[in-house]
């Protein structure tokens, strides 16, 4: 097991806060908060949805999908974080619920998955440089026309 130092502990907390800020920004539609989550040149591979290159492209993808939902809730847990100087890897489980709109108002689309991230320490704090989402299970249909993985 790695030696725990005050800096290592602080890094772990800061990284977990970045991961949590992502989920909170999605659910509250606070898209500008994603500037505090991703590097400008970040890459996100939402397996089954597509690969986005750049923070702007990532923001446009999640905005386009989530504004078609009445409400969402992205819950994260089982954080595993490994810090190596100014780089880190992190993984966490995702349980995400998406409520439909209009004809789909009574429907829920649920995703269980795992985020795997590569982070870098910047002058402004930790940021995700690469994110991948692997879906373990998905169920439901809220009329997103294939924009989210369906099982």
Segments from the language model and where they lie:
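Short, low-complexity N-terminal intrinsically disordered segments enriched in polar/charged residues
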Residues: 1-28, 32, 36, 40
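Charge-dense, low-complexity intrinsically disordered segments
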Residues: 5, 9, 49-52, 106
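A beta-strand edge to alpha-helix "cap/lid" segment located at domain peripheries
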Residues: 3, 67-151
